[in-house]
Amino acid sequence: MSKRRVVVGMSGGVDSSVTAWLLKEQGYDVVGLFMKNWEDDDDGEYCSTRQDWIDVVSVADLIGIDVEAVNFAAEYKDRVFAEFLREYSAGRTPNPDVLCNAEIKFKAFLDHAMSLDAEMIATGHYARVRERDGRFELLKAFDHTKDQSYFLHRLNQAQLSKTMFPLGEIPKTKVREIAAQIGLPNAKKKDSTGICFIGERPFRDFLNRYLPTKPGPMKTPDGKVVGEHIGLAFYTFGQRKGIGLGGSKSGSGEPWFVAAKDIASNTLYVVQGHDHPWLLSRELVAGNVSWVAGEPPADGFACGAKTRYRQADAACVFGGAATGAAAAGPAGEVRFSLAFDDAQWAVTPGQSAVLYDGEICLGGGIIESAATGQPGQATSAGHAPALAEAR
């Protein structure tokens, strides 16, 4: 009887290496697949994959599996990077890891794995898949400190039905122990941080290679000019560092934060104080929705939600139809709203709002706008809250 073939996405890191070893130990026919998603020619200094490939080959030799490399750089540029630039150009702050998982790691990679006669694919993500009543559920990892379901919320039933997450029930500390015990050559390799194509350089330097600077005024909510920004794309909501303002502009001494952008006037609005009303939101509207089960929760469903990675679930109520002044976005597009029990800090257009029912990840959407802590005010990627100077 032939063994079930599983193709493992191997990055050269500890997590995917231990994933491959665990599946081999469980008796699967394991094939490693290394994905090259960025061409070295595009940026040889920051994104060389040479060492990662060497690590993958070394691990494959140790545990006794075949491995191959596949180039998805063209798909990555078309499906992920182009959207990344479009979002920043529109004043939003996208999360390319979410799109990469949906379009590359669990679409292009999955399709290629099936061409290798695989029954399943596996990755080193910290999450779980459970089949119940004929449907597949995406669950948080047992190790909540490493849970990555937020980045996986756009996966659908077809993708989950072919996916395994062997590390979902193992603490990260145990994964490191396993790597050391079996003598993996990359056992002490640091976890990757950030986005591959950005590398370790300052994010602003990278973005400036693709988006032009367009300086404009930096204003307070009452319209006072306190500085000049280099371009709205280079700032994100809640940003504190890199603004170029001290605490002396108003004499309060409190730090400054980016609070809003107005694309039409090319104005960046900043406020002083972490808990300024312009930084606090009780409601949001999200579009470009995706539900793991293929359908949304019921209107009025009480759930938890994250508006950024590593955030604790925030209690909220789901609304299936976005209404009111905050309902920005293309006419006819399916959107949803969330009303939070407690005000959320720096809810950022372009990031994902991901819903949870306890351990179950329901799906989510891309944040389009958020109502601020002041009645009747909302902020979106291109519009600041109602301004004092305009009242």
Swiss-Prot record:
The record marks H125, Q351 as: Interaction with tRNA. Disulfide bonds join C100-C196. The keyword Zinc does not apply. The active site is at C100, C196. GO terms for cellular component: cytoplasm. Keywords: ATP-binding, Cytoplasm, Disulfide bond, Nucleotide-binding, RNA-binding, Transferase, tRNA processing, tRNA-binding. InterPro entries: MnmA-like (IPR004506), MnmA-like_C (IPR046885), MnmA-like_central (IPR046884), MnmA-like_central_sf (IPR023382), Rossmann-like_a/b/a_fold (IPR014729). GO terms for biological process: tRNA wobble position uridine thiolation. It catalyses: S-sulfanyl-L-cysteinyl-[protein] + uridine(34) in tRNA + AH2 + ATP = 2-thiouridine(34) in tRNA + L-cysteinyl-[protein] + A + AMP + diphosphate + H(+). It is an enzyme of class 2 (transferase). Residues 146-148, 308-309 are annotated as: Interaction with tRNA. It is found in: Cytoplasm. The keyword Aminoacyl-tRNA synthetase does not apply. GO terms for molecular function: ATP binding; tRNA binding; tRNA-uridine 2-sulfurtransferase activity. Belongs to the MnmA/TRMU family. HAMAP family: tRNA_thiouridyl_MnmA. This is tRNA-specific 2-thiouridylase MnmA. It comes from Burkholderia cenocepacia (strain HI2424). The lineage of its organism: Bacteria, Pseudomonadati, Pseudomonadota, Betaproteobacteria, Burkholderiales. The gene is mnmA.
